[in-house]
UniProtKB/Swiss-Prot annotation:
Belongs to the peptidase M1 family. Expressed in the intestinal brush border (at protein level). Highly expressed in intestinal tract and kidney, present in liver, lymph node, spleen, and brain. Found as well in monocytes, macrophages, dendritic cells, veiled cells and B-cells but not on T-cells and thymocytes. It catalyses: Release of an N-terminal amino acid, Xaa-|-Yaa- from a peptide, amide or arylamide. Xaa is preferably Ala, but may be most amino acids including Pro (slow action). When a terminal hydrophobic residue is followed by a prolyl residue, the two may be released as an intact Xaa-Pro dipeptide. Glycans are attached at N106, N114, N128, N234, N288, N318, N332, N573, N606, N624, N734, N784, N817. The gene is Anpep. GO terms for molecular function: alanyl aminopeptidase activity; metallopeptidase activity; zinc ion binding. Disulfide bonds join C760-C767, C797-C833. This is Aminopeptidase N. The record marks Y476 as: Transition state stabilizer. Residues 1-8 are cytoplasmic.
Length: 966
């Protein structure tokens, strides 16, 4: 599943400069709302009503839970192994006379008894069963022998089970089949089998679609809903004749539905053995464009008819074939299925989902309009497609046995997405962006004492909430970062060889992460050119089983090199023990006297002449930032690097110019170097035209904005930024012929946006005049938006910030009428840039109205308002006042609460705010925080660190900016 909560490069830059906090650090998904019970009931009553009390899903209640009973344990027992399912589903796309959208289903599951048992335990969630002989299921054997009689069936809500108690025992080795008939709500909760809605003109259209990961296949039909319980699935859908149906496999047969001639019944080919969370089926009025890849795979891009007609699926179609072919070569394994459908959904919780053969996306992650979408939108599409297609092998063909190893699925896909996208767009240098997008973003979280290791013991991850909490930036971005490091020190060829062996060995089955280490080690053992200092497992277990990362410190006078667990707050208490005592085995590529060399640090401290320098030479560690660690030097070497940057910055690689800025600011935050040294590392930016160093600087200085935009420090800080960015602004003004053209490369286009955003936010008059004029021209002629798509987020946000009610209302009207999701996203984010508190308060009230803001976008919109210094107190008051209501009514199991907590607390830097946060925790302890629990602890830790940092650095920072802003 792709990272859910996405902010474009442009919007991310705006966030840095206008106080909009960077909220991409944690994987964030949107608020899941309570089911609507009475909407549109007057329009139609064609769907059946839900059954009465005889088949209600009333849970079995007992005074105390007996944990010894298998149905009270969250993990399935090993007694039964599923072989196959036959599932028939009929979604009703109009509400019944209760006002509910529902679906009806029939399911037959075939399973083998692995251990003798007198109880069948299978997952079921929010399903109403039709009783058959006073029971919810019918059981039989395949060999004709009598099956045990059913004593009773019950639904256990806590563990989400349908439990079948038998009067006798199932026989080990014998196969059985169990039938059930059920109904469920086709709710708009973005989980399981759900509905998505969109407008076509004035007509509301409804889509029936799915999102099974992690534990919601059970909400669609009764199933053994764990990733290791692989089986074959035979899916049949019944739907109106004017619609189309899709599933993981190609249709096998379509025919009129005998009971209703207005409907079609389509049976799909049986799937290979696969996990329940990868199932998908969709009924809609969508259209598609298609092609056949070089390897004979049928490719389809599906979306709303208007989006397809306007060519918004063309780019996705053009890159899908090459990316599929790239991964087939990269894995040395053919694509496992006959077709690859990808579909853009109006309402979708995550960024995308890798359902095998039918990948589902948010519209913004799949559709691209060449006239209205930005280069950032285009990059988003190609990287998310690459991420999801990477999963078709790694995750789908071979699947982790349990969610505690989710990092292997998502971390791997988050790494190779850059390789696949780079293959599709070879001129973009996308692989370099991983340093900014993943390595540096996740370090901000992994440097906290409340972080967690990539891999957890399986018995620590049991409940759906615990599973969902794993979908965070550690899993995705740290996973990607350490796999990138592994591939780098092994070499890509060796890495691919081990990977191919792993996939061939475990195809259609399940693994633990140690299986990958074993196959990579085999590849190492078969050659002699690459010989790490220890086995792959010995090296990598220290990166997988320990939280955090080291700071590598070099003394160029003595040649001493050492490592230490890096903590943003050096006073924080690390309560999680490590069997490795927070010592890592770190590969260290370095540059000295213009020559590259390599070193392994596998102890806490060592000494080598390699790290000693003469009076006129410097050393630079972690070339191209392939290692997942920070680097610190003695003061003398820092000064030499600064002198080099200010005399001839081209001698130092672009990525490492960004690294010098990033690492020094983090070291300063941890009080390992003076804050003024880190600030000195930005002086060379007046001569810098490359994107990565500028972006690293702006990301680092964003923390200063959050800490100081309510204090006197902010004035000289803005003046300094204005001084540094002015040459860059006029450089791009000249390069683009006064903003008429765009620079040729991706990185240049991103830095053009940096230049405009920074210049406007720091008060450069020429920039303000530019954005106000562009926005004014659009307001005069709303049907002719001449603002280039790359610049729209920047122009919209700044014009709204500089303007008032008229500018905001115009943007709101354009947002309401936007037909392209990328344009709507730009406007929705820019609407949070207003400086008028009453406007922001009104906008906040709109966020919980799904007629105004889609539910998938609620969290990101609230966070955008909170990240505006004028809107921050409004949102904090709102969250505190409404937490219980939000948590109980809007889905405690969604990812959004972690992001809400993180987004609202980013500015906290005073004792008063810490007290408020502690009181918030105490006041809501009974309600709980669900998947936001860890985020709350991180917020408390970060707030304490912020308080100390501001106290210690405010005067020095104020003095430095004052002295360097003239």
């Amino acid at each position: 599943m792709a990272k859910g909560f996405y902010i474009s490069k442009t919007l991310g830059i705006l966030g840095i400069l206008l106080g909009v906090a960077a909220v991409c650090t944690i994987i964030a998904l949107s608020v899941v709302y309570a089911q609507e019970k009475n909407r549109n009931a007057e329009n139609s009553a064609t769907a059946p009503t839900l059954p009465g009390s005889t088949s209600a899903t009333t849970a079995t209640t007992t005074p105390a839970v007996d944990e010894s009973k298998p149905w009270n344990q969250y993990r399935l027992p090993k007694t039964l192994i599923p072989d196959s399912y036959r599932v028939i589903l009929r979604p009703y796309l109009t509400p019944n006379n209760q006002g509910l959208y529902i679906f009806q289903g029939n399911s037959t599951v075939r399973f083998t008894c692995n251990q003798t048992t007198d109880v069948i335990i299978i997952h079921s969630k929010k399903l109403n069963y039709t009783l058959k002989g006073n029971h919810r299921v019918v059981l039989r054997t395949l060999d004709g022998t009598p099956a045990p009689n059913i004593d009773k069936t019950e639904l256990v809500e806590r563990t989400e089970y349908l439990v079948v108690h038998l009067q006798g025992s199932l026989v080990e080795g014998r196969q059985y089949e169990m039938d059930s008939q059920f109904q469920g709500e086709l709710a708009d909760d973005l989980a399981g089998f759900y509905r998505s809605e969109y407008m076509e003109g004035d007509v509301k259209k409804v889509v029936a679609t799915t999102q099974m990961q992690a534990a919601d296949a059970r909400k669609s039909f009764p199933c053994f809903d764990e990733p290791a319980m692989k089986a074959m699935f035979n899916i049949t859908l019944i739907y109106p004749n004017n619609l189309i149906a899709l599933s993981n496999m190609l249709p096998k047969e379509s025919k009129p539905y005998p009971e209703d001639p207005s409907c079609t019944m389509t049976e799909f080919h049986s799937t290979p053995k696969m996990s329940t969370y990868l199932l998908a089926y969709i009924v809609s009025e969508f259209k598609n464009i298609s092609s056949v890849s070089a390897n004979g795979v049928q490719i389809g891009i599906w979306a709303r008819p208007s989006a397809i007609d306007e060519g918004q699926g063309d780019y996705a179609l053009n890159v899908t074939g090459p990316i599929l072919n790239f991964f087939a070569q990269h894995y040395n394994t053919s694509y496992p299925l006959p077709k690859s459908d990808q579909i853009a959904l109006p309402d979708f919780n995550a960024g995308a989902m890798e359902n095998w053969g039918l990948v589902t996306y948010r519209e913004s992650s799949l559709v691209f309009d060449s006239q209205s979408s930005s280069i950032s939108n285009k990059e988003r599409v190609v990287t998310v497609i690459a991420h999801e297609l990477a999963h078709q092998w790694f995750g789908n063909l071979v699947t982790v046995a349990w969610w505690n190893d989710l990092w292997l699925n998502e971390g791997f896909a988050s790494y190779v997405e850059y390789l696949g996208a780079d293959y599709a767009e070879p001129t973009w240098n996308l692989k370099d962006l991983m340093v900014l997008n993943d390595v540096y973003r996740v370090m901000a979280v992994d440097a906290l004492a409340s972080s967690h290791p990539l891999s957890s013991p399986a018995d620590e991850i049991k409940t759906p909430d615990q599973i969902m909490e794993l979908f965070d930036s550690i899993t995705y971005s740290k996973g990607a970062s350490v796999i990138r490091m592994l591939s780098s020190f092994l070499t890509e060829d060796l890495f691919k060889k081990g990977l191919s062996s792993y996939l061939h060995t475990y195809q259609y089955s399940n693994t633990v992460y140690l299986d990958l280490w074993e196959h990579l080690q085999k590849a190492v053992n078969q050659q002699t050119a690459v010989q790490p200092p220890a086995t792959v497992r010995t090296i990598m277990d220290r990166w997988i089983l320990q939280m955090g990362f080291p700071v590598i410190t070099v003394n160029t006078n003595t040649g001493e090199i050492s490592q230490k667990h890096f903590l943003l707050d050096s006073k924080s208490n690390v309560t999680r023990p490590s069997e490795f005592n927070y010592i890592w085995i770190a590969p260290i590529p370095f540059l000295k006297s213009g020559q590259e060399d390599h070193y392994w640090l596998d102890v806490e401290k060592n000494q080598s002449a390699k790290f000693q320098t003469s009076s006129n030479e410097w050393i630079l560690l972690n070339i191209n930032v392939t290692g997942y660690y920070l680097v610190n030097y003695d003061e003398n070497n820092w000064k030499k690097l600064q002198n080099q940057l200010q005399t001839d910055l081209s001698v130092i690689p672009v990525i490492n110019r960004a690294q010098i800025i990033h690492d020094s600011f983090n070291l300063a935050s941890a009080k390992m170097i003076p804050i003024t040294l880190a600030l000195d590392n930005t002086l060379f930016l007046v001569k810098e035209a490359e994107y990565m160093p500028w972006q690293a600087a702006l990301s680092s200085l964003n923390y200063f904005t959050l800490m100081f935009d309510r204090s006197e420090v902010y004035g000289p800080m803005k003046r300094y930024l204005k001084k540094q960015v002015t040459p860059l602004f006029f450089y791009f003004q000249n390069r683009t012929n006064n903003w008429v053209n765009r620079p040729p490369t991706l990185m240049e286009q991103y830095n053009e946006i940096n230049a405009i955003s920074t210049a406007c936010s720091s008060g450069l008059k020429e920039c303000r005049d530019l954005v106000v004029e562009l926005y004014s021209q659009w307001m005069k002629n709303p049907n002719n938006n001449t603002i280039h798509p790359n610049l729209r987020s920047t122009v919209y946000c700044n014009a709204i910030a500089f303007g008032g009610e008229e500018e905001w209302n115009f943007a709101w009207e354009q947002f309401r009428n936007a037909t392209l999701v990328n344009e709507a996203d730009k406007l929705r984010s820019a609407l949070a840039c207003s400086k008028d508190v009453w406007i922001l308060n009104r906008y906040l009230s709109y966020t919980l109205n799904p007629d105004y803001i889609r539910k998938q976008d609620t969290t990101s919109t609230i966070i955008s308002i909170a990240s505006n210094v004028a809107g921050h107190p409004l949102v904090w008051d709102f969250v505190r006042s409404n937490w219980k209501k939000l948590f109980e009514n809007y889905g405690g199991g969604s990812f959004s609460f972690a992001n809400l907590i993180q987004g609202v607390t980013r500015r906290f830097s005073s004792e008063f705010e810490l007290q408020q946060l502690e009181q918030f925790k105490a006041d809501n302890s009974a309600t709980g925080f669900g998947t936001g629990t860890r985020a709350l602890e991180q917020a408390l830790e970060k707030t304490r660190a912020n308080i100390d940092w501001v106290k210690e650095n405010k005067d020095a920072v104020f003095k430095w900016f004052t002295e360097n802003s003239s």
